[in-house]
Regions:
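Alpha-helical ds-nucleic-acid-binding substructure associated with the helix-hairpin-helix region
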Residues: 11-78
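A short secondary-structure junction motif
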Residues: 1-8
Length: 158
C-alpha cells in the first residue's frame, strides 16, 4: 500500500510537470522531486538499478545550470562521462557542436568508411578525433549534430 501511494505521488507530480503552465527543465524537475522527497521513489520505479550511484549523480547534476553548464562542468559530476555530458548539452541546446559517440553513431561512422571502435572510446584524445570527424560529416551534410544524432538513432536502434 505504501509503495502504491508513493507511485501515485510520483505519477501525479509528473502530470503536474507536463502541464503547459509549468515549463521545468529536466534539472528543475529533478530538483523539485528531491525537494518533495520523491527522487528516490522515482528512481526505484524506473527499475534502472544502481539507485545510489544514479541518485548521487543526479544530486551533482542539479547543482548545475542546464542552460549554461559546459561539458567539463558535467564531466566533473561523478558518473558522468564524455558521452553523457555531450548528450545532455546537445539535446538541451540543439545548436551545440558536439557528438554523442554511442554504439549507433560509431556504427554509422564505420558505414561511412571511418575506422571506429565498437564502444564509446575511453581515451579523450580518440573521442575528440572521432567527434571532429562526426562534426565534419555534419557540416558536409549541412545538418546540426543533434539532428543527425537523432536521425542515426532512429535508423540504427531498430
Amino acid at each position: 500500500k505504501g509503495s502504491q501511494q508513493t507511485a501515485d505521488k510520483v505519477n501525479h507530480y509528473f502530470r503536474e510537470i507536463e502541464t503547459p503552465t509549468k515549463q521545468l527543465t529536466p534539472f528543475e524537475g529533478i530538483r523539485a522531486m528531491k525537494d518533495l522527497k520523491l527522487l528516490s521513489a522515482w528512481l526505484q520505479m524506473t527499475k534502472l538499478g544502481q539507485y545510489t550511484r544514479i541518485y548521487n549523480a543526479l544530486l551533482g547534476l542539479i547543482k548545475l545550470d542546464l542552460k549554461t553548464c559546459s561539458v567539463k562542468d558535467l564531466e566533473s559530476v561523478h558518473g558522468i562521462g564524455p558521452k553523457t555530458a555531450r548528450f545532455i548539452i546537445m539535446h538541451s541546446r540543439p545548436n551545440q557542436r558536439l557528438a554523442t559517440l554511442d554504439t549507433h553513431i560509431l556504427r554509422w561512422m564505420r558505414d561511412q568508411g571511418i575506422d571506429t571502435p565498437k564502444a564509446t572510446p575511453q581515451s579523450q584524445k580518440l573521442y575528440k578525433e572521432l567527434e571532429d570527424k562526426f562534426l565534419t560529416l555534419c557540416d558536409e551534410s549541412a545538418i546540426l549534430p543533434s539532428q543527425l544524432d537523432l536521425k542515426i538513432w532512429k535508423q540504427y536502434s531498430k
